[in-house]
Structure formats: structure tokens, C-alpha cells
Amino acid sequence: MPKNALIQAFHQLEAFKWNPQEGFRLASGKNSPYYVDCRIVLAHPHSRHLVAQLAYHLLKSLDFTLIGGLEIGAIPLATGISDYGYRADPQREWRTFVVRKQPKDHGLGKLIEGTIHPGETALVVDDVLTTGGSLIKAAEAARAQGLIVTHGLVVVDRSEDEGKSNLAQMDIQLLPLLTLEELRQTPPFVR
């Protein structure tokens, strides 16, 4: 199964780490005994393919035309899903967009790169959900450009109430591929 293979890839690539003594400082500012490094997973073709495959099967019944998120982390995730979707069904052209952390200070000064049109429906993506901050920033930027954002996909949901609550307040339904608990409960990691 692709899900089990992806979980194993996290362990084989050492993209899931545990350090109960010192922990890890997360992008949210929180400290956690667990660290999930999706950049490593998305840097390998096989595991990137597994992510895209799982995402495609989760998303194919939804109605949206765009996939995007914050630079840099969302780029391989959005393009991988978009490419997989097109190969699986050439009628499905999920275009991608990238939300810059800051608008460019030259050229057109864009905050969002990609071909977007007000009224289109967009899916926002991120690697890991803790507080939901990155998904929310991407959704706010997309909505400011007239896009409709109703769903957010993450590779790993850390299953913290704050993230789900923050997304719910923004009317964004969470679609996780994996949970932290699934990574923790799978050999060789079981402690």
C-alpha cells in the first residue's frame, strides 16, 4: 500500500526523528520531541511519487483548479501532485501557484506567482501541520486575489488541536496524508 510505503520511507530516510531529552524547535516556535522533515521525503523521487499518489486519490473527487502554498516548501508538493494528476487523467490540469513570503520589490511586485483568476477554486498545501500558520498565510494571500480556498492538504498532521482549530476558523477543511501517530506507531520507530 502506498501509505505504508510512505511511512516506511520516512523511517528509512530518517525524516522522522525523536529526541525526548532536548526536543526540536519547530517553525511555529513550539518545542517537540518529534521532528518531521518532509523536505527529505520530497527530495527523493520514489517517496515524492508516493506522496503525489496518495494525494491524488484523496483529491480526485474534489472540485478545484489550482494547487499552491508558501515558498519554498509547498513547491515540490504542489508540482508533484499536479504532475501526478495530469498523468493519471490528462483532462485534470491542476495548475500550481506559489505564495511568496514577501511581495517582490521589483518587476510586477507580485505576492503570488502563477496563472490565477479571481473566482477559481484553490487547494493550499504544506508539508506539516502544527499551528496551521503556513496554510493560513497561503489561504489569506490566495483569497486576497479572489481565489476560493476550502481545503488544505498536508503530508503530516501533527494532530495538535491548535492547527485544526485555526483552519476551522478560516473555513478550511484539513486533508492529511499521514498523522504523527501513524509515524510513531510504525516499526522501526515504536518506543
Model features per residue range: what roles?
Residues M1-L62:
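Active-site-facing substrate-recognition patch
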Residues P2-Q12, E140-R191:
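PRPP-dependent phosphoribosyltransferase catalytic core
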Residues K60-T65, H117-G119:
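Short helix-loop-beta connector
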Residues S61-L62, L77-W94, S165-L180:
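Short acidic, glycine/proline-enriched helix-loop-strand junctions
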Residues D63-G73, L153-V154:
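Short glycine-rich phosphate-binding loop at a beta-alpha junction
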Residues L77-L123, G133-I136, P188-V190:
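Short, glycine/charge-rich flexible loops or terminal/linker lids adjacent to PRPP-binding catalytic cores
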